[in-house]
Amino acid sequence: MSLTDILSPSDIAAALRDCQAPDSFSPKKFFQISGMSKKSSSQLKEIFRILDNDQSGFIEEDELKYFLQRFECGARVLTASETKTFLAAADHDGDGKIGAEEFQEMVQS
C-alpha cells in the first residue's frame, strides 16, 4: 500500500506546495491540507507504517527529517529546526521518537 492509496494525490501535492520554503513546515497544517486529519484510526496506522521507513515501530529523528520525501521523492528535507519542532510536538513520552499512538494523537488533535 502507498500513501496515495489513502490520501488524494492532489491533496498531497497541495500540502507539499504549502511548505516548499525552508522553515515553513507546520505539521498540523500539513495534516489538514493533505487530508490526513480526516482519516480513520486504521488509516492513520497504515500511514504511520508507511512513514516508519525502517519498520521499527517508531519514527525517529533521522526518519522525520525525510518526512516530506515519503510523500514525494523530490520534496525537500525538513530543516533541523523543523525536525526538532515536529518531534517535540509529537513525542509525549520524551523518548526521542514518535510512536504510532503519538502520531495518531498529533494528527487528530
From Swiss-Prot:
Keyword terms of this UniProt record: Calcium, Metal-binding, Repeat
Binding-site list for Ca(2+) 1: 52, 54, 56, 63
Record carries keyword Kinase: no
SMART domains, A to Z: EFh
Keyword Metal-binding assigned: yes
One annotated Gene Ontology cellular component of this protein: cytoplasm
Molecular function GO terms recorded: calcium ion binding
Residues of the EF-hand domain: 39-74, 78-109
InterPro entries xref list: EF-hand-dom_pair (IPR011992), EF_Hand_1_Ca_BS (IPR018247), EF_hand_dom (IPR002048), Parvalbumin (IPR008080)
Positions contributing to Ca(2+) 2 binding: 91, 93, 95, 97, 102
Expression sites by tissue: Restricted to the thymic stroma.
Protein family according to the UniProt entry: Belongs to the parvalbumin family.
Function, as annotated: Binds two calcium ions.
Other known facts: This parvalbumin has an isoelectric point of 4.6.
Protein name: Parvalbumin, thymic CPV3
Record organism: Gallus gallus (Chicken)
